[in-house]
């Protein structure tokens, strides 16, 4: 299965915030022990890049992605660290184009018809309804 298929097959994609990269592998192993083989590590802390790298190197069966990616530089750093997919809170055409060009699964946050159409134009079929709460979601 490719990354998109693994994401689709997963009942849940835990969004993980790690303040210390030393906790990354233990967190990934706990998820794997519980039957979860996909995780998104947010780029909201300084430990994100090292956390992704540690999981990618130590837990090969885990599909690890980077979340809260808002710049192309973060995207590149995440992929270089071993992220297999990227999640962003909004649609950034530069990030999306780079991911498409480099065959990296990208899940941008989209809520407006304009954002959804831009994503479809880039060939994306999986989007994140975000921010859901603002638009009546849970």
Please identify what each model-predicted range represents.
Residues 47, 70-73, 79-138:
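Conserved anion-binding
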């Amino acid at each position: 299965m490719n990354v998109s298929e693994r994401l689709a097959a997963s009942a849940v994609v835990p969004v993980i915030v790690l303040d210390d990269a030393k906790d990354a592998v233990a967190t990934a192993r706990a998820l794997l022990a519980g039957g979860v083989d996909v995780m998104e590590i947010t780029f909201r802390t300084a430990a994100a890049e090292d956390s992704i790298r540690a999981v990618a190197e130590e837990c090969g069966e885990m599909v690890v992605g980077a979340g809260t990616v808002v710049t192309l530089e973060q995207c590149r750093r995440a992929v270089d660290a071993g992220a297999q997919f990227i999640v962003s809170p909004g649609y950034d055409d530069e990030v999306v184009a780079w991911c498409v060009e480099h065959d990296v699964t990208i899940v941008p946050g989209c809520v407006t018809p304009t954002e959804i159409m831009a994503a479809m134009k880039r060939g994306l079929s999986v989007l994140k309804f975000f921010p859901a709460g603002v638009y009546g979601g849970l």
